[in-house]
């Protein structure tokens, strides 16, 4: 089912309109903005990842999901022709597939200028605007960069949840699962988790080693950790996760002389206090922490077009 959230009354009489997407593999958030009255609306469709999906698959999502939503929002069956600018930020938008994604969007939004970029640049623009800063993504996985106000200057490779992704939900899940079964966390926490989640040791091993999307399962344990954050052992685990993220990633950008660090993603958002403690420990100051980049992306593009 497609979800939409109205942030303000949306006008149907439009002039210059822009469409911005923040896309992951499971969900894409789209924000539609009309320049003549300042109103905007966010809608969601299934995820688009040009690295894993074919041109035909992407175009079907655009035609069957995005266009009907736009037509409904704008009360116009020719809604695609009203869009004059499209910015698409996606997790799978590596250099090798940028032209592919641009082509898919151009085929739908023929009247629009199209820009396609990776999710890290989108996060940096949403968090820092046109100012230099350190931008981080902390969700299921993690990523970070030093951004000079225009482009990403340096990106410490996150290496994924097996080799890296410090600070992420998946990394927190690894620490948690390891801790409850190797005895580094108290027995009562292990029993509480197994009972609340109605899961066994064997099922956990199955999900991690034999089922797909082990990273998402590991990250899902962060909900339990957050729920029981009053337990000092779990609070310490969260702190250790963020300390590791700063030590192995953020500290590598210290030579640029910028101390402000900002983050997007549910792990940074819900565990913000621990994130701020880790930042201070390593000599940084937290500027912004947002759960989603979509409104920051819109603010960036509005300012750029003025």
Residue map of PLM features:
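Phosphate-binding/catalytic loop of phosphoryl-transfer enzymes
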Residues: 93-188
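Glycine-rich beta-strand-to-loop/alpha-helix junction loops that act as flexible
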Residues: 87-94, 138-141, 259-268
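Solvent-exposed, flexible loop/coil residues
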Residues: 52-55, 87, 97, 160, ...
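ATP-binding/phosphotransfer module of carbohydrate and carboxylate kinases, centering on a glycine-rich
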Residues: 2-83, 127-134, 175-306
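Proline-centered loop/turn at the N-terminus of a beta-strand
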Residues: 85, 113-115, 260
């Amino acid at each position: 089912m497609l979800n939409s959230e109205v942030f303000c009354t949306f006008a149907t009489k439009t002039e210059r309109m822009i469409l911005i997407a923040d896309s992951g593999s499971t969900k894409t958030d789209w924000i539609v903005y009309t320049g003549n009255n300042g109103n905007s609306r966010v809608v969601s469709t299934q995820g688009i990842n040009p690295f894993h999906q074919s041109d035909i698959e992407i175009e079907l999502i655009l035609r069957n999901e995005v266009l009907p939503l736009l037509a409904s929002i704008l009360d116009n069956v020719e809604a695609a022709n009203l869009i004059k600018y499209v910015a698409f930020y996606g997790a799978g938008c590596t250099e090798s597939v940028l032209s592919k994604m641009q082509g898919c969007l151009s085929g739908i939004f023929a009247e629009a200028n199209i820009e396609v970029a990776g999710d890290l640049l989108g996060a940096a623009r949403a968090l820092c605007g046109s100012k230099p800063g350190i931008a981080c993504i902390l969700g299921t996985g993690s990523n970070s960069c030093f951004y000079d106000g225009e482009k990403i200057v340096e990106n410490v490779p996150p290496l994924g949840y097996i080799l890296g992704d410090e600070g992420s939900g998946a990394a927190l899940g690894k620490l948690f699962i390891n801790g409850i079964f190797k005895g580094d966390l108290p027995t009562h926490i292990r029993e509480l988790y197994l009972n609340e989640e109605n899961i066994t040791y064997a099922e956990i091993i199955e999900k991690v080693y034999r089922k797909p999307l082990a990273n998402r399962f590991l990250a899902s344990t962060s909900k339990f950790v957050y729920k029981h954050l009053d337990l000092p052992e779990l609070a310490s685990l969260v702190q250790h996760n963020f300390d590791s993220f700063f030590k192995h990633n953020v500290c590598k950008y210290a030579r640029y002389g910028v101390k402000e660090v900002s983050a997007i993603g549910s792990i940074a958002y819900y565990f913000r206090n621990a994130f701020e403690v880790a930042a201070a420990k390593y000599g940084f100051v937290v500027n912004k922490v947002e759960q989603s980049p979509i409104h920051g992306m819109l603010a960036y593009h509005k300012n750029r077009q003025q």
